[in-house]
């Protein structure tokens, strides 16, 4: 349990370090040490849990309630980030969807937080697939962060050269970009270890906003346009995800993946009601995975440093 908390929270340390570091050498040190620790702990988690079979992890009710409140606050902050950028760049559709998601997030929090202790007793879950995904996130993700240290130096040098030819200067936003990459890792660990759908939704939305900010990294008209294509399509998925959660809650169904699986095999009248939330969650997955007909944002995302 402690290791799962560590994997989720520790990437925030190098993320903060990237924002505070001054100079390439300091950023390299933060990135290499942070990535090395994440990979090492990931391997330890895999060794400890891979042969033990599926496990649910209990969290103290008070702690669980506080973490649910924090996840709701994060959801609202993410909506605020989207709305700020939508207003800044005058994108009407993103503004409308951002308002819808903000209202939905606040309504869902008001519905569920009073009963959060009941629905988040065992919010974390590991099975074989979870462990494989933890390895993928921790090892592959960390290696990407390490590679980005050198890649972003070349990217910035090229950016500065092109700007100089135009008689301009190129701002250095590498600290923010590298911080977003480690924040992305933290959110991915939340996604692959959460049984609680509220927590999973929070991690889901963090990755959505991180992708938006990274796609728009250069602030060129093309980058901004493609970033908004991504955020609009992913917000459609986020709203579908949120609608699915609200449907589950209103109909008295569990807000956990394991609870939904258990209910699906119960053969009760309530089991039939699972069709709608499963469809909504699947729609969210299609947008996130850029599957047809939501695939159009993925090509545009290549304008990001990649």
Residues covered by each model-derived region:
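Cytoplasmic-side transmembrane-helix entry/capping segments in multi-pass membrane proteins
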Residues: 26-37, 91-105, 173-182, 227-237, ...
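N-terminal signal-anchor/start-transfer transmembrane helix
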Residues: 6-24, 79-83, 286, 290
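Membrane-helix interface "capping/anchor" motifs
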Residues: 20-29, 84-97, 220-222
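Alpha-helical transmembrane segments
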Residues: 8-12, 31-42, 75, 98-106, ...
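Structural signature of hydrophobic alpha-helical transmembrane segments
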Residues: 1-10, 62-75, 128-138, 198-210, ...
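Alpha-helical multi-pass transmembrane bundles of energy-transducing inner-membrane proteins
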Residues: 176-269
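Hydrophobic alpha-helical transmembrane segments in multi-pass integral membrane proteins
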Residues: 59-188
């Amino acid at each position: 349990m402690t290791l799962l908390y560590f994997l989720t929270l520790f990437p925030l340390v190098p993320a903060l370090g990237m924002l505070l570091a001054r100079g390439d050498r300091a950023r390299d040190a933060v990135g290499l040490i942070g990535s090395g620790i994440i990979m090492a702990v990931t391997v330890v988690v895999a060794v400890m849990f891979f042969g033990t079979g599926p496990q649910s992890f209990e969290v103290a009710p008070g702690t669980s309630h506080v973490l649910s409140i924090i996840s709701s606050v994060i959801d609202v902050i993410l909506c605020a980030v989207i709305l700020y950028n939508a207003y800044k760049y005058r994108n009407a559709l993103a503004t409308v969807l951002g308002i819808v998601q903000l209202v939905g997030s606040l309504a869902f929090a008001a519905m569920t937080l009073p009963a959060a202790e009941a629905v988040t007793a065992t919010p974390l879950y590991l099975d074989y697939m979870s462990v494989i995904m933890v390895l993928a996130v921790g090892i592959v993700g960390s290696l990407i962060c390490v590679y980005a240290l050198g890649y972003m130096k070349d990217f910035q040098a090229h950016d500065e050269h092109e700007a100089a030819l135009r008689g301009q200067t190129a701002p250095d936003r590498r600290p923010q970009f590298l911080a977003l990459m480690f924040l992305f890792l933290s959110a991915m660990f939340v996604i692959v270890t959460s049984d609680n759908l509220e927590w999973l939704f929070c991690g889901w939305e963090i990755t959505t906003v991180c992708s938006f900010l990274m796609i728009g990294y250069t602030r060129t008209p093309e980058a901004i346009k493609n970033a908004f294509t991504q955020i609009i399509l992913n917000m459609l998925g986020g709203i579908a995800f949120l609608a699915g959660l609200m449907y589950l809650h209103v109909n008295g169904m569990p807000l956990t993946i394991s609870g939904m699986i258990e209910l699906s095999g119960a053969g009760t009248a309530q089991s039939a009601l699972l069709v709608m939330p499963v469809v909504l969650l699947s729609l969210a997955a299609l947008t996130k995975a850029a599957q047809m007909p939501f695939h159009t944002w993925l090509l545009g995302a290549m304008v990001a440093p990649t």
